[in-house]
Amino acid sequence: MDDLDALLADLESTTSHISKRPVFLSEETPYSYPTGNHTYQEIAVPPPVPPPPSSEALNGTILDPLDQWQPSSSRFIHQQPQSSSPVYGSSAKTSSVSNPQDSVGSPCSRVGEEEHVYSFPNKQKSAEPSPTVMSTSLGSNLSELDRLLLELNAVQHNPPGFPADEANSSPPLPGALSPLYGVPETNSPLGGKAGPLTKEKPKRNGGRGLEDVRPSVESLLDELESSVPSPVPAITVNQGEMSSPQRVTSTQQQTRISASSATRELDELMASLSDFKIQGLEQRADGERCWAAGWPRDGGRSSPGGQDEGGFMAQGKTGSSSPPGGPPKPGSQLDSMLGSLQSDLNKLGVATVAKGVCGACKKPIAGQVVTAMGKTWHPEHFVCTHCQEEIGSRNFFERDGQPYCEKDYHNLFSPRCYYCNGPILDKVVTALDRTWHPEHFFCAQCGAFFGPEGFHEKDGKAYCRKDYFDMFAPKCGGCARAILENYISALNTLWHPECFVCRECFTPFVNGSFFEHDGQPYCEVHYHERRGSLCSGCQKPITGRCITAMAKKFHPEHFVCAFCLKQLNKGTFKEQNDKPYCQNCFLKLFC
């Protein structure tokens, strides 16, 4: 356990220098060989029954084929001349001298063209701890190991860069090389005490490493895997495969993943998950998804590399090998999202019954629906025919089976006011074969609105009663006002009955008789007065003979002397102070 604590401390101190490739040591270090004493002894006669695989083999702790054991001083190759079967070697934990019955092997069939030697190193323990102390120590070390692996994963996203030639190069693979056992030089030729075996690691680029003293990450992980048993076997072996130790060991050796390949697969998995989050919506055009659940698709058995037998990666990506295309168009992306949503709801058992077919796009309606004009519409497709604006919850008008918004409908189809030429939205007045706003239908002369008495029309214009009669009704010859009701027609004009009187005395004409002078009606007296046919003596009109004297007219019997009152019929008279006198009276009075 002290060695395990030291390995954990060294692993924690070297995590900041880890690259994606494991660091191979250029020379031997104290960490390159186990601390326990190992013995080696050639097997002369193979036993009939091979031993069962150890707990490390069942837990998946199989040494890398690259690992080779060599002694600290020299290396010898031992091959059995007559048998090419691999040798299973086991070493004791406490004894320092090997026992021929402690290490056994079995002949097996030849695998490939090379010989394999499988070794299970065991560590020497100074003292056997109690089970309680052992479990507590293992639990704490496992927790520390989990924390260090998390730090290792974090370092993998920001690794220190190697030079181009080292980053692109990979460690040399074993190829067709045979596994080698290194036997140290001892005093005894055979069966003596063997020195500590050292584990030789291949070197990167001719033996160059990041550090010559620090152990590599792969060697540390190998030591940890061999020291701490895993509670759950990583590899499942069928019962039919347990009959042959060589088959079990070969399967375990093929499925073992090194630390560098595991971290590389972890990086690929994280990158695939990131791509799935970004391009998840773009790759669901057919409505199918591959969920990143961690189990293989189609019921296939998952392989250690993270790829199932069906050939799909359980990383959230589809099985298509074609690269993802460019971003789809907004319309196709919307249709793809709607189709994926509907398929997902159907998979979950949620029934998505279409509410109808849109009258515009002829597609089924699954969300909000607008019902109008006996049809169903998508809300975004129920628009005005003229301006193409969404009508929504506003009022609309129908014309020839097409919807129109209120503004466009009135501008296109509403009646126009004759006065302002604007559309009539509410009440309308129809007059004179035209349409009007109620507030624009008024008297053309005074601008007053028409009352209950109505209006009068003249030359296509509307007038109130007063203005119409004032402007167009016949005028009275006496008062010059419009004649609205009864009238008298005389002297080529119309008269109010109360206005047809003598223009001098304003006396109504009795029996309808009147005298006209200069276009005006007069009574008889004023008529003769105006004409001068009134007797100057009696002040009555002269209808018969008359005498004209002193610029006056007289009845013959009324032309008399102003003093004696005798009729002046002879035609001679004297005038004095505008009065007529006979000859005798004139002589008497003025002579």
UniProtKB/Swiss-Prot annotation:
Motif LD motif 5 per UniProt: ranges: 333-345
GO biological process: cell adhesion; cell migration; cellular response to reactive oxygen species; endothelial cell migration; growth hormone receptor signaling pathway; positive regulation of stress fiber assembly; signal complex assembly; signal transduction
Annotated Polar residues bias: 69-106, 121-137, 236-260
Region of interest called Required for binding to PARVA and ILK, as start-end residue ranges on this chain: 262-315
Post-translational modification: Phosphorylated by MAPK1/ERK2. Phosphorylated on tyrosine residues during integrin-mediated cell adhesion, embryonic development, fibroblast transformation and following stimulation of cells by mitogens. Phosphorylation at Ser-244 by CDK5 reduces its interaction with PTK2/FAK1 in matrix-cell focal adhesions (MCFA) during oligodendrocytes (OLs) differentiation. Phosphorylation at Tyr-31 and Tyr-118 by PTK6 promote the activation of RAC1 via CRK/CrKII, thereby promoting migration and invasion. Phosphorylation at Ser-250 by SLK is required for PXN redistribution and cell motility.
Modified residues (N-acetylmethionine): 1
Annotated Gene Ontology cellular component terms: cell cortex; cell-cell junction; cytosol; focal adhesion; lamellipodium; microtubule associated complex; plasma membrane; stress fiber
Motif (LD motif 4): 265-276
Sequence motif LD motif 1, location on chain: 3-15
UniProt modified residues of type Phosphoserine: 83, 85, 106, 119, 126, 130, 137, 140, 143, 230, 244, 250, 258, 261, 272, 303, 322, 332, 340, 533
Motif (LD motif 2): 144-156
Record localization: Cytoplasm, Cytoskeleton; Cell junction, Focal adhesion; Cytoplasm, Cell cortex
Motif LD motif 3 per UniProt: ranges: 216-228
Modified residues (Phosphothreonine): 132
Entry-linked SMART domains: LIM
A GO molecular-function annotation: metal ion binding
Modified residues (Phosphotyrosine): 31, 88, 118, 181
Gene3D superfamilies: Cysteine Rich Protein
Residue ranges occupied by any LIM zinc-binding domain in the UniProt entry: 356-415, 416-473, 474-533, 534-591
Known role: Cytoskeletal protein involved in actin-membrane attachment at sites of cell adhesion to the extracellular matrix (focal adhesion). Recruits other proteins such as TRIM15 to focal adhesion.
Family note: Belongs to the paxillin family.
Protein name, as recorded: Paxillin
